[in-house]
Every structure is written in structure tokens, then in C-alpha cells.
Amino acid sequence: MPEITIQELFDRMPEAFLPEKAGDVDAVIQFHLSGEEGGDWAVTLRDQKCVVEDDIVVENPTMTLTADAQDYKNVILGKMDPMAAFMQQKLKLKGNLNLALGLLKYFKMD
């Protein structure tokens, strides 16, 4: 079975979103991913909903995550520890870092 693509990961985010875990989060997260499957995505978490926009760069996001697409995919799929990826600068974060700490909890990962 082929490995999931980055686009599929983003497409699945709204259905994997756990509003009960996110609570009253109100944030826009900009993803800048480089490499073979790279691109720009904006994920808005607001009013207990998750909205994903493809091929967009937003002004003044709450947080920006920059990474190689494969490294990001490895974190999401549990093949790479998120904290280790951050410490090794494979994931670069700018903005509200508390949001980054909670982000993985807001989504069903199976």
C-alpha cells in the first residue's frame, strides 16, 4: 500500500479534528513545507472547527511551521519524535509555541 501523501494528510485534518480537545482555540497555522511534496497550507482552528486551505500564505498567522515535507510527514505518522525534530531544527516554529505543544492532541492520529 502506498504511503499517504502530504496532501492527503491535510485533506484528512478536518475529519480528524477533535473539538473537545481543542476547546476554545482560535488560531491560524501556516505550514510551509519544502521538498518533493512541499507547498503552503493554512489551517484555521476556530469555533470548534478545522478548515484547511491549500496553496495559500496568510498574513500574521498565530503560528508558522516550516519543515521538509518528509520530516513533517514522519512526525505526523509517529516515525519521528516532534520534540527531537524541533531540537534538531527539522521543524521550525515561529509564533505561539504553546499552540505547537497542543497541536498533535487536537487531532485523531490513527
What are the residue ranges of the model-derived segments?
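Feature captures hydrophobic
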Residues: M1-D110
